[in-house]
Amino acid sequence: MNYMRTAVLLAGLTALFMVVGFAIGGKGGMMVALLVAAGMNLFSYWYADKIVLGMYGAREVDMRTAPEFVAMVAELARRAELPMPKVYIIDNPQPNAFATGRNPQNAAVAATTGLLQTLNPDEVAGVMAHELAHVKHHDTLTMTITASIAGAISMLANFGLFFGGGNRESNNPFGGISAILMAILAPIAAMVVQMAISRSREYEADRGGAEICGQPLALASALAKIAGGAHAVPNYAAEANPATAHMFIINPLSGARMDNLFSTHPNTENRIAALEDLARQMGGYRPAPARAAPARGPWGGNTGGTRRGPWG
């Protein structure tokens, strides 16, 4: 199902890429865009996860550098019957997290230092279980490729404003006007595609994550805290790369941008209500939280030296 959705998504974004190419350079531009899109689709499949992690300066951690956090992810992955993903930490004060990778065998999960410092252990476990649910559902392939291609569409459309608007070839009857329109409409269209695949997927990952960690209310509490932090603490890397916003557990954009009018996430209050309903259905089912024995800190390394982590 997710592979079919990914194929449809790639076809749609490739078609949009070609439309932008036609607006910039007529039929020749459209053919060039087709070739570029084909190359991008292949490149995105293999390398988009590394690009996204690089955008946010994520650093990989292990049992030596972040023993408690990595042990928590390992236990959650065991419960989810998943291979152990790579674990990353992003030095960013906004509490947030995402997962990436083309399949469960090549997956990675990333959390910000803000998340590790803001949430308690049960809430962190709920968030990471949510991200592992994305991995289990193969959502990470769709999310990562969407981020890569949607960002390229926006870049190409803006490029057309400066270099394509003057094209007056007979095979492009719309000329500079179409380049201007594409610069405005293409990023919006790409964002609409992101919205179409994101909303139901988040509900599914919330439910799957709650079942993995066994604590729906801990995840609900985490969502409330993350949403408050996302509004209060700007994420400048996300503001510079809005095409990746749909990858995070909560929209990282501050709301000052037009992008936030086209939210890639369902309403947080609705997600919390759904988790509360799930908690009532699960009744007294509360397995022990996924945490390791006390150690020197949940993520290790030096995050500034001024604050201890929730388990340190």
From Swiss-Prot:
Keywords: Cell inner membrane, Cell membrane, Hydrolase, Membrane, Metal-binding, Metalloprotease, Protease, Transmembrane, Transmembrane helix, Zinc. The keyword Coiled coil does not apply. The active site is at 131. The chain crosses the membrane at residues 6-26, 28-48, 145-165, 173-193. Residues 298-312 have a biased composition (Gly residues). Its EC number is 3.4.24.-. The keyword Electron transport does not apply. GO terms for biological process: proteolysis. It comes from the Bacteria. GO terms for molecular function: metalloendopeptidase activity; zinc ion binding. Residues 287-297 have a biased composition (Low complexity). Belongs to the peptidase M48B family. This is Protease HtpX homolog. It comes from Azorhizobium caulinodans (strain ATCC 43989 / DSM 5975 / JCM 20966 / LMG 6465 / NBRC 14845 / NCIMB 13405 / ORS 571). The gene is htpX.
